[in-house]
Curated annotation (Swiss-Prot):
Residues 252-298 form the LRRCT domain. This is Leucine-rich repeat and fibronectin type III domain-containing protein 1. SMART domains: IG, IGc2, LRR_TYP, LRRCT. The chain crosses the membrane at residues 537-557. The lineage of its organism: Eukaryota, Metazoa, Chordata, Craniata, Vertebrata. It comes from Mus musculus. Residues 299-386 form the Ig-like domain. PANTHER family: LEUCINE-RICH REPEAT AND FIBRONECTIN TYPE III DOMAIN-CONTAINING PROTEIN 1, SYNAPTIC ADHESION-LIKE MOLECULE SALM. InterPro entries: Cys-rich_flank_reg_C, FN3_dom, FN3_sf, Ig-like_dom, Ig-like_dom_sf, Ig-like_fold, Ig_I-set, Ig_sub.
């Protein structure tokens, strides 16, 4: 059945085009998106990307890394970064022409192992460094024309010396090239160096360039071309025709003389090179000038030093020699002994042909020869130099004694005269010998006239190298330092003097000596100064610490001894007051407070009760009641000031006695309660006369002054304690009154009481 007009076969592609369309669809589906305003052609197996005149400021980062050909021409890319072409191992052709590239990062093309053509022309490159083109091992075409390149490093082309075929460095500012690297480009076909500032080509540069077919040196500053077998290939005969070679060197200021005669003899056509010099050949076509006119002029010396130059020994002298010729001659100098002079520590030849001798010697006396040479010949001119010797300080003796021949100045020379002479050896003395130094002495050398200096030579038995020391002629001793310990040394002293017969410096052996240095010192060496200082500091610190510890121990022992003595004194005698265990005070009707106070060292007299009759005890209680009422009245009259008496037990009393000794306590109303029993020990203020209270010394326990009294309770004499007017009942408790001597009448029993400030405490608060 034939297909209808609307059959699906009308919309299906032809069978022959189906594989091609599938291939295009597969390539498009696998490829990355094309950068904006760029044209991408993904025709397998080639991926081409064209981004010309798109205004790019840098290399787009979205470029497919599988691209084979990339053209980024006519943009504004200013720099090539390291990451711009990273991992583009399939890139074969890269064009960056007509941009503003001024910087190329090191290793920017390191991943382009398959790159064959690199176009960087019409940019702003100023130099080509050795690390910029690294990694281009398969490069065939390198186009760097129309830049601002002034310098090309010698290692810039090392990566592709054996593979490059086309090198273009035209329209730059090059004054020189690494000609040695260019000579190793064995596969080079085209070398374009036109419109630069090159003025010299190294001889033998093109010897190995057998495949070179085009050399363009147009518009440079070349004056001549070195003869090279490269230019003679087209003239060689034989069954094999020569390789065609095109050499262009027009626009150079060629100097047409005999040095370019080899080039004139070549058969060339349609070349319009002209001559710039000499004057009679200016602006004439190079190939139209007859060979007879390519002439050279031999050198002519136009200026030289006078026929004779006088100079004092040791001073400098300059010998001038100028020559003219075509080509410009080169000047050399020859010494009086026939040596060709060059630049050394004593002589220097300038570029204009002047010879400078910085230090003249007597051997410089004679005729120096100036030689000027070029391709046409050479010219010579002699210059005589007369060196005047230095005058001697003392005139030589009229008849000097006969001397042996001057010996060698080297101690290592065998058979030196006087070296083994016993007389000379006795003249030299080695004194003050140590492991690293020795002092050498020798007598004055009167028979030798005009001694300039002494030379000391010595070497070790384990080392054949000589050590030289030059010392003044006035010295007769020399200290040799830096010697090795335990070694044998040979030492000789030589006198350097003026030989009157030859007018040259001569040497004579003064004497020789052999000695052996002392052995190594003991392995235990004294401590160095800084170590010794540290040890002294540690020792002094230890002494100080030990002294402090001893002082502390003594203080502790003393404190313990005195503490034990005080306790024994308290327990055994009545001269030391007992330690206070409680302090009872009352202020303005407040409750009793207790505080501990340190014992006072003051001595008081204590009155102990031996036997108290019942009648006396009743009278004492009656007197207490009377005094209590009087105290209440006085307290009210003083504006609320109150006084309290506390009976403090001593350490000798037992617990029951302490409870029995507790004195009457004052109630909230200010009345004293009756005592439970008579106290065996009473703490009273010494002295019979009552004392007026001192308001300026009153203290109050209302605040936190209890702690103050505890930490700062200093002992006070009983006579400084003020008696309160509320205590007269203590004076009459025994039926008697206190006398001037402090005795109290207690019936038939009288005793002496010792009072302490801690056993009787009086407080008065206003």
């Amino acid at each position: 059945m034939a297909p209808g007009p609307f059959s699906s076969g009308l919309f299906s592609p032809p069978p022959a085009a189906l594989p091609f369309l599938l291939l295009l669809w597969a390539g498009a589906s696998r490829g990355q998106p094309c950068p904006g305003r760029c044209i991408c052609q993904n025709v397998a197996p080639t991926l081409t990307m064209l981004c010309a005149k798109t205004g790019l400021l840098f290399v787009p980062p979205a470029i497919d890394r599988r691209v084979v050909e990339l053209r980024l021409t006519d943009n504004f890319i200013a720099a090539v970064r390291r990451r711009d072409f990273a991992n583009m191992t399939s890139l074969v052709h890269l064009t960056l022409s007509r941009n503003t590239i001024g910087q190329v990062a090191a290793g920017a093309f390191a991943d382009l192992r398959a790159l064959r053509a690199l176009h960087l022309d019409s940019n702003r490159l100023a130099e080509v460094r050795g690390d910029q083109l690294r990694g281009l091992g398969n490069l065939r075409h390198l186009i760097l024309g129309n830049n601002q390149i002034r310098k090309v490093e010698s290692a810039a082309f090392d990566a592709f010396l054996s593979t490059v075929e086309d090198l273009d460095l035209s329209y730059n500012n090059l004054e020189a090239l690494p000609w040695e690297a260019v000579g190793q480009m064995v596969n080079l076909n085209t070398l374009t160096l036109d419109h630069n500032l090159i003025d010299h080509i190294a001889e033998g540069t093109f010897v190995q360039l057998h495949k070179l077919v085009r050399l363009d040196m147009t518009s440079n500053r070349l004056h001549k071309l070195p003869p090279d077998g490269l230019f003679l290939r087209s003239q060689g005969g034989g069954p094999k025709p020569p390789t065609p070679l095109t050499v262009s060197f027009g626009g150079n200021p060629l100097h047409c003389n005999c040095e370019l005669l080899w080039l004139r003899r070549l058969t060339r056509e349609d070349d319009l090179e002209t001559c710039a010099t000499p004057e009679h050949l200016t602006d004439r076509y190079f190939w139209s000038i007859p060979e007879e006119e390519f002439l050279c002029e031999p050198p002519l010396i136009t200026r030289q030093a006078g026929g004779r130059a006088l100079v004092v020994e040791g001073q400098a002298v300059s010998l001038r020699c100028r020559a003219v010729g075509d080509p410009e001659p080169v000047v050399h100098w020859v010494a009086p002994d026939g040596r060709l002079l060059g630049n050394s520590s004593r002589t220097r030849v300038r570029g204009d042909g002047t010879l400078d001798v910085t230090i003249t010697t007597l051997r410089d006396s004679g005729t120096f020869t100036c030689i000027a040479s070029n391709a046409a010949g050479e010219a010579t001119a002699p210059v005589e130099v007369c060196v005047v010797p230095l005058p001697l300080m003392a005139p030589p003796p009229a008849a000097p004694p006969p001397l042996t021949e001057p010996g060698s100045s080297d101690i290592a020379t065998p058979g030196r005269p006087g070296a083994n002479d016993s007389t000379s050896e006795r003249r030299l003395v080695a004194a003050e010998l140590t492991s690293s130094s020795v002092l050498i002495r020798w007598p004055a050398q009167r028979p030798v006239p005009g001694i300039r200096m002494y030379q000391v030579q010595y070497n070790s038995s384990a080392d054949d190298s000589l050590v030289y020391r030059m010392i003044p002629s006035t010295s007769q001793t020399f200290l040799v330092n830096d010697l090795a310990a335990g070694r044998a040394y040979d030492l000789c002293v030589l006198a350097v003097y003026d030989d009157g017969a030859t007018a040259l410096p001569a040497t004579r052996v003064v004497g020789c000596v052999q000695f052996t240095t002392a052995g190594d010192p003991a392995p235990c060496r004294p401590l160095r100064a800084h170590f010794l200082g540290g040890t002294m500091i540690i020792a002094i610190g230890g002494v100080i610490v030990a002294s402090v510890l001893v002082f502390i121990v003594l203080l502790m022992i003393r404190y313990k001894v005195y503490g034990d003595g005080d306790s024994r004194r308290i327990k055994g005698t009545s001269r030391t007051p007992p330690r206070v265990s409680h302090v009872c005070s009352q202020t303005n009707g407040a409750g009793a407070q207790q505080a501990s106070a340190p014992p006072a060292p003051d001595r008081y007299e204590a009155l102990r009760e031996v036997a108290v009759p019942a009648a006396i005890e009743a009278k004492a209680m009656e007197a207490e009641a009377t005094s209590t009422e009087l105290e209440v009245v006085l307290g009210r009259s003083l504006g609320g000031s109150a006084t309290s008496l506390c009976l403090l037990p001593s350490e000798e009393t037992s617990g029951e006695e302490s409870r029995a000794m507790t004195g009457p306590r004052r109630s909230r109303s200010g009345a004293l309660g009756p005592p439970t029993s008579a106290p065996p020990t009473l703490a009273l203020v010494p002295g019979g006369a009552p004392a007026r209270p001192r308001p300026q010394q009153r203290y109050s326990f209302d605040g936190d002054y209890g702690a103050l009294f505890q930490s700062h309770s200093y002992p006070r004499r009983a006579r400084r304690t003020k008696r309160h007017r509320s205590t007269p009942h203590l004076d009459g408790a025994g039926g008697g009154a206190a006398g001037e001597d402090g005795d109290l009448g207690l019936g038939s029993a009288r005793a002496r009481l010792a009072f302490t400030s801690t056993e009787w405490m009086l407080e008065s608060t206003v």
